[in-house]
Amino acid sequence: MKRILVALDSSPCAPLVLSAADKLAELTGARLVVFRAVTVPPDMPRDVLLVSDLRLEDILTRNARGDLERLTRDVPPARLEKLVASFATPWDGICTAARNEAVDLIVIGSHGYGVLDRVLGTTAGKVVNHADRNVLVVRAAL
């Protein structure tokens, strides 16, 4: 195993998922590609969506990348290959990033933050069903 895609969201479980992936990378000598998909939050006020000088997509992606930088602060540089933030539907963005980055494994948390996850099925479940490579699902402490 050479490369692991770690799919993180903004939930409180993200550090646990990152820690599990980092331990696996340490044991296998793999490097981490840390990923976050961002979308427009459903509760975002409509007037924010009408920002003219700044593209909302760019703002959200830049903020997500900053979050990834903070989350990965304690990961040894030798194991951290890159950070990727993408404006995409989470499950599709994760599967696409895994292909584009040619990773050997996807590591994802079992429960995300989204309300839609409870209605339409979890992001983790969709990744497991659609990914063309192995997926390790990290279960949050109950």
What role is predicted for each listed range?
Residues 130-140:
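Short, acidic/small-residue loops that bind anionic groups at enzyme active sites
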Residues 2-51:
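Small/aliphatic-rich secondary-structure junction motif
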Residues 36, 109-111, 139-140:
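Short secondary-structure boundary segments
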Residues 52-66:
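A short acidic, glycine-rich active-site loop
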Residues 49-53, 100-101, 124-126:
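Short, hinge-like loop/turn segments at secondary-structure boundaries
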Residues 105-126:
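Glycine-rich, Arg-bearing micro-motifs that act as flexible, cationic patches
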Residues 72-106:
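Structural beta-alpha unit
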